[in-house]
């Protein structure tokens, strides 16, 4: 049959027209919408907008089923015009790029034509309407390397392209909106067959079956009865088919269904995804077996063999009692050893699916507990029909006999848990229908439905291979669309649907087995009968599945909750709280009362849980009646999420439209609309509704801990699956077993790593670590066949496969630009570019500064190549570049959910306030507000703790007694932070006097009565900009300043600056009000003062060394994983595919290698995500569409002189620019190549480490000029110019910045190199070769060789940086011990150097002391008088320095800990008795210590209790938080503190933290060893005994020696300290110090203004001193913790560092501005040269056991002056 012979491919004219041309509605929209919003727009553009919005509204009207008795036209019309045409304006906005306008539409009022949307700028050079030009501009690379930019107008074709895609999105989302319980309600299982949409679907699917059309009101039963029964012969079947008369099938653009009822899209997607793909991995449960001559599913059969009640209830192994576990063990043994034929048949398939799909199968194989007798990757369908023999049974028994019983139970549990998400579970277990239908001894089983659906979505290709077509409707090519319609509608076709022979639905093997009397010649007849019975039920099955999955909903406008005029008239008020209460009352009255409520509870299914709403457990809270509240009662009381604009029906449509068509989304929105809480919900729902993905995984980053926890709590509670619930036994909230929402930060987590559908909210550092290890966010395994040129195995080479770690990455609060965030956004671009099934969602309160950056940076991500692949846009030549990636979730024109009144100063008033007096002005304004208003809390923004302390004192002294001022900053305890966050609850019970609010609890001696305070003033740093929502907040006072800490890589110190805030920060502070009610914002500055202030990028403010050394690759011969040659998205490769297809010039078996040379690293991703049908030998399946393009090449024209209309219509510029100039290079296997990380071309980082000193071209990203930043010192600029050979700043105006060298990264890497963390090694081209021993095809081998030979040329003398072996192993130690304190490389070096001496725990103690008291004077007892200071100093002065003081202190504390058995916890096995005792009590529901209860409850809820590894999980879960009680330890510490004049509280803090960290180390090392011994890790890197390496390679000869004594422990501590901190050396100049590596002048810090002596215990300063840390205040550098050293010690301790410092002419100090200090240091360096020992250097590098660095050093020292060779 010729293509499309049955399809009428119509235009949009066929769509039913509710609003007709020039009718009253049409005129109204023209007059009141288009002409009002765009009054001066060109008439042709107005007409375009009007016609388009009419088309969209008609589509909505038709697709959502308006025009019926239940949903009359007037209902939709009222919805469109209520609230000042709010929804109509929202639809209009959805058709256009995002326009940042106000409520009055002032910008739109000025628009004259649509072309100007992209073009018009304001006086500041910013685009008036949209920033789309930044990702749409035309670019051309000039000969000088500069990129020229030409503006692209917004032409009509772009608008129409987007309109077509929008209409498709409406069809895709129709009748499936998120249930908001306002105007979107779930369709109930009990009455779906009464709905018009059901009846229309029945008619549609049967309208082609018979010439006598059936009445649309007939039920499915009636339509079935009206169909003629097929005759019993092939001839009669043929005659019956030929009698059918057909109409051609109408479609719009070959994909969109203009017929009533469920769309063909929904029908196909449900069949393909819900009924076939979703069940594939568990389908053995619906296999049929013959029992009493009838088919019985394996599930029902096994229910007779096992007690499935616990499994079906979702109870895990850990939740069974002993009798239940014994019973299950006995049942399994009986089943495993049974001689029953049916048992053996089921066992065979159980074994096969267990081997293939059990989550722990690989671990069991490594442990030799699961024995494989065949490859589980075999196709299951072959296995289904394998003949069961004694041999196969014996294989299965042998394979499973050693598998632990809990693993058997776990597999059953996992399989049933996933199976419970499917329609098959619903029909068998809930609907209690073992058979779907039966007639004349023919039974339709669930397995028959599966086979029908599988057959429907499969075909036999030209090679005779049975092949599955794409899963999604819009991924089907037109020929498959026709094939599917022929099958679904059962249209006779001699090729595609002929029932006289074996047809597409062919289950002959099944028929032979279950209908053995059927003759071979009658098989077509029997197939037809089965098919007909299935078709009679398929509509019901589809509806049941959509309802069961919780995605079929009914949008029915409800003016009583959405019409503001109606609400205002009903309540007689505009009060926000009264409005919310009225809405709650309406919801309760209409939906949640009486029978209506019962129907929704018992017959509506929740998409999240797959259960009815009555199965949601009540929310538990101490404040609820009887501590419980049912979910529907919660919805009608305390929540407001259902009313947020994010849940508005038009907002939802717009969201799903963007989600479906974009891989990167930029989401902004008004304050309180639900950006942080509702967007994640919509994404979770989109995965199920749009992606049909029941196992979607979303991760969302937050910049700080409070919003991480609060958002997880809020979202989970709003979803009805709270992560915490009140526990009456402990009178506290505890974690629940709900893991749909999870969270994690450094100190706490609520995570189930086995969960398959979740939203995980984490602090951004957590995700960054994961992304470093998972470059494409997919699964990866080591490639065992990868070798180098010499045949050595390369265990770091991997292959990357489908199966995402996360499907969606959300970066929330992105405007804050902390370093982790921007690195995530950087790494995410490469991940998403390669892995087209992942999405990046950037959520920000404001995007004014960032949007141009995002648009430029993510241009490379081509939305046309999103998975699922879209044949729809390919066939219709639509380009997703023509739709905007930005979504603004707000009512049109609104900036906040509630009204905010702004009060800015005039420019004259603003000029009076500066960094010296803003504190006083802030205090004054706050006092004025507090005294002039009567209710509502106040939030005052200050810059730091000192400001806050001053403000609290002043404000509390000058405000009424019912108002209390409290501080909020990051250093506060978690308890105090929680008090502030929940101040609306805690204020009434707050009883401190105002004067006492900052005292420690132990110092409180008096109290005010409860209820004294009714208002709070929160004085906060910028940490409150995004981390808290204060429910009673009415006023914000913003001083407009912030403290910024900036790292100076020249001086090597952090400087603190007080600077004006950015505009985005100002908007964030403003956004603290207007979230839950209206409020006022008082800015102590004019708008003009901040509007141009740009965000300070944290990555440019920090020391990037530690981050960069993690990112850099480990081996010089590690090549790019993906380069232009093997990039499936590279346009030249796509063009090559098209050419090969046209010329037929290829060998199918070699095709993918012929195209990409080396696709091996991501072969699986290419096969499954870049082909319509996974078959790399079939060139017709390659998805080559990348967007509109033609033969017109931009370079042929001068855009300023010619008409580019043809080019603009047919090309999106990125395609040609990328092909020629935008080549993609991914990271390497072990990290990034050095030149990519250095990024001198400014193309890798979204925010460059040197971003704060450069001005960029926003269109191209290229550097335009140097920026002078107030927070950057002159010395940095001097060095920068020196490196670039620029003598004067005036020369900058004449240089080409294309070749300008930025220095922050090179400086960081130089520092890392001196610490031997990285190496500079020769990068030889011949090294970049990987061979694969399992590739025997010579052609394929030649292609891979061609790939590696074609990588960018590296000259023989070129150098590249890689991780040192030391760094690689230090990373292993960091991973093993998992302590934040060791994330600093100085600390991990010190700790590691101490391991060979077994002093690492002593070193940890000293580290903790320094961490707790960064300023040494914090060790002094603060209660002692001034005169005691001298006594204290005299007592602790020593000649060996401050580290010696800490060592001595530790040696006095340690005996106390030993004497009181506080170090016994280090013996992990000692915990077994506690574990066993508390486990027994927990399972008996007896009270145990609360922390133990939390741990056991977590193990119980996650299924880890009562398992083989339960003690391992227990140990891993312990967080040892030592709390000092009033006991013997406390008394001994008190005596010690008194005797030593020490700060007792500081000692107690130290003991608590040390014991916690020390235990953590023992715990982690024990776990690491356990994992090795029990083979729990797949990654061989994790199976390495890292301690053995350290002990062997970091044991150096002593540098501190004594003539008569062996070095003692202090000597070893000192030696390890010098080795780790040898870069921190200063030369003592008497009254000041000079840093040895850069000549920075450092003045001694003083104990106090009363004691001007230097702040150190060192009383015998030597010429050279090591300091531990430094800071900078008021541009003065201070150093802390001083240790005297000898010159020889430091030269021998780190000979590499001092080799480069002394001999390297490119050292930084040689390029600094020559001052007296620099001269002094250079002279010092020259003077120490004779003392430097090259011999020691060689011995040192040899001992490090790193041949590469040994060769390098030997090579470099060749030719040095002989005087140094001693």
Swiss-Prot record:
Molecular function (Gene Ontology), one example: ATP binding
Q: Where is this motif: DEAH box?
A: 812-815
Q: What is its EC number?
A: 3.6.4.13
Primary enzyme class: hydrolase
Name the UniProt key words of this record, in alphabetical order: ATP-binding, Helicase, Hydrolase, Nucleotide-binding
Which of this chain's residues are annotated to bind ATP?
Answer: 669-676
Record keyword Nuclease present: no
Helicase C-terminal domain sequence ranges? 947-1116
Q: What is this protein called?
A: Putative ATP-dependent RNA helicase R366
